[in-house]
Amino acid sequence: MSALRTVSGSSGNGKSYDSIMKILLIGDSGVGKSCLLVRFVEDKFNPSFITTIGIDFKIKTVDINGKKVKLQLWDTAGQERFRTITTAYYRGAMGIILVYDVTDERTFANIKQWFKTVNEHANDEAQLLLVGNKSDMDTRVVTYEQGEALAKELGLPFIESSAKNDDNVNEIFFTLARLIQEKIDSNKLSGPNSGKDGNISINANKGDSSKSNCC
């Protein structure tokens, strides 16, 4: 795997980055999208994170295969009443992370509906990635094998994570950014299934149990 790391400073052309990637996090309310984002960008964890209203976003510049890439990370609300607002942000997204909670089977079952919504509103070339969050919890009801099977069915890369324990959080965003960059470099920008056929699976280690709603 190519070296992936956070970078800072300015390039010779006066910009602090070479390119921009717009990435969305989607999934039911309470699956931990905001906590994953805050852990990645700020390396912080708040177990009582306030539910996102509409849209929020953060920015982080990283090094992808020697290129400085600015990630625009959009955190979308999972509630039904915000769906009309959030789907407008799908267009132009280069990467979309579909998140479910391994302790809540309903959020796992709803991934197929989120996937359908992505196919209806996002660009065909958008790179998708499936994430099972809260892997540290001992109240898990969705197994790693179930997540992996769903990812295979949908043709998506798959990672399990814990924002609380910081398990595989960086891997989520770096893996997606690398897949996007590889697609850009190889000019794979067309076709109904372009960018949706990954075989990457990363299993987070199980940690201590937690009663947090944002793990």
Swiss-Prot record:
Superkingdom field: Eukaryota
Q: Name one GO biological process term.
A: Golgi to plasma membrane transport
Compartments reported by the entry: Cytoplasmic vesicle, Secretory vesicle membrane; Cell membrane
Q: Which positions bind GTP?
A: 27-34, 75-79, 133-136
Biased segments, Polar residues type: 200-215
Q: Does Nucleotide-binding count among this protein's keywords?
A: yes
Q: Which residues lie within the region annotated Disordered?
A: 187-215
Tell me the PROSITE patterns matching this sequence.
RAB
Alphabetical list of Pfam families matching this protein: Ras (PF00071)
Q: How does it sit in the membrane?
A: Lipid-anchor
Tell me where the sequence motif Effector region sits in this chain.
43-51
Q: Name one GO molecular function term.
A: GTP binding
UniProt-listed NCBIfam families: small_GTP
Task: Identify its protein family.
Answer: Belongs to the small GTPase superfamily. Rab family.
Q: What is this protein called?
A: Ras-related protein SEC4
Query: Encoded by which gene?
Result: SEC4
